[in-house]
Amino acid sequence: MSEIVDLGLSFRTLSSNITPQGVTAHYGGPSPWRGFRTDHNRCPSIVRSWHAYHLSKGWSGLAYSAVVCPHGTIYKGRWKGKRTAANGTNPGNQRSYAVCYLAGDNDPVTEPAKRAFHDAAHALGQPLRWNHAEWKSTSCAGDPIRAWQRAGWPPPAGTNPTPQPPSKDWFDMA
């Protein structure tokens, strides 16, 4: 399970008017990494800066339910039971949680990020279902996320091993 981090973001009043039917994947616009993708220490400050930017626009705060970073950490945004402001349409915000990848449009979706997307969706109680462009005409969620979606949102290899059936010895212990 990916680590879920609560940065203690302060929100203005958030609506609980949401009837989620899935999770919409987003990316954060231009890449924030500029060659420093390995610097996980930058992730919390980038999430906080997005929150401050959204507040400056008069919004209630970070528009996303959660943010996942390339290193596999999930940062709580509005979280479960709160309406998003990220999907671009009233139906999108009503029917879907929004999980944003802390990356740009051409940044690859790392294996830890794929695990974090799946874990965030599980924690929100909904399946990964849409990319942002399915709600509104936009370049978001970028080609790498769209390609991952077209492939069926596969989780990283080796993260969901099939357990071996019990051996004869296990049954003989009874």
Regions found by a protein language model. Give the residues of each.
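N-terminal post-signal-peptidase region of extra-cytosolic proteins
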Residues: 49-52
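Extended, low-complexity, turn-rich repeat/linker tracts enriched in Gly/Pro/Ser/Thr and Asp/Glu
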Residues: 55-59
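Basic/polar, cationic surfaces and motifs that engage anionic cell-wall
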Residues: 1-38, 42-45, 61-62, 70-173
